[in-house]
Amino acid sequence: FYKTAYRMPTFNDLYYTDMGNPALLPETTTQYNVGAVYDRTRTEGIFRNLHLNADVYYNDVRNKIVSWPQGPQFRWTTINLGRVDIRGVDAGAACTLAFPHEWTLTGKLQYTYQEAIDVTNPSDTYYRDQIPYIPWHSGSAIIALSWGTWSLGYSFIYVGERYNQQENIIYNHTQPWYTSDMTLMKEIRWGKARLRFTAEVNNLLDQDYDVILNYPMPMRNYKFGLAVEL
């Protein structure tokens, strides 16, 4: 498909303390996308569903609005990048297996390749460099095992190497990171209400990583929840 998009700066983009930029221009994007989807569903046997998808896209972005920490104090700054060319591929797969005694296994894979280069000014030192904090490679994997009203899930997220400033030099290189999470869920009927109890372990492997340089993410942590549907 082909479409154009228009994005006005948000109030925070313009006026957030020490970060906003009242001089920001609106962002405009021209998008081109070609994709394919395959979906197969069965009501019998082990293999119940198979889903495959792939998209190839190109975005021509003018006055792209971006924010990242800059300078010796790593203060957040919001600016326009005059022109950014974005090319990428998204691919995904999902499969559901059904076993006797209400056992179900679901798996999902997602992969993205993205090249987002600054083509504003050929005289800039970062001309045709990848823009900050956009990885070339990223992906995720999810596995969920269900039995009756119980469900156990595992998720893995990977983000490849990036650069934390506009110049793609060794000093600005940022290492890849990955993290694993697990979730246990139990549903209970109570009268007309449905209760859903959840227990999560996030950053299961206790990884030390930064999504943004010098902004460390939490180490292993736990979360418990209860949702009620009436």
Q: Where do the model's predicted regions map?
A:
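Residue-level signature of outer-membrane beta-barrel architecture
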Residues: T4, P26, Y38-R40, E44, ...
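Extracellular loop and loop/strand-boundary signature of outer-membrane beta-barrel proteins
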Residues: T17-L24, R75-L81, D124-Q130, E167-N172, ...
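Flexible, solvent-exposed coil segments and beta strand-coil junctions
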Residues: P9-M19, V66-W76, D118-D124, V159-Q166, ...
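Membrane-embedded beta-barrel scaffold of Gram-negative outer-membrane proteins
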Residues: K3, R7, E27-R87, A94
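C-terminal beta-signal and adjacent terminal beta-strands/loops
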Residues: R62-N63, S67, L105, I157-Q165, ...
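Residues that define the transmembrane beta-barrel architecture of outer-membrane proteins
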Residues: T28-Y32, R48, D85-V89, W103, ...
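Gram-negative outer-membrane beta-barrel transporters
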Residues: N49-D60, T77-Y163, K192-R194, L205
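Residues on the lipid-exposed face of transmembrane beta-strands in outer-membrane beta-barrel proteins
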Residues: V34-Y38, A91-C95, L109, A141-L145, ...
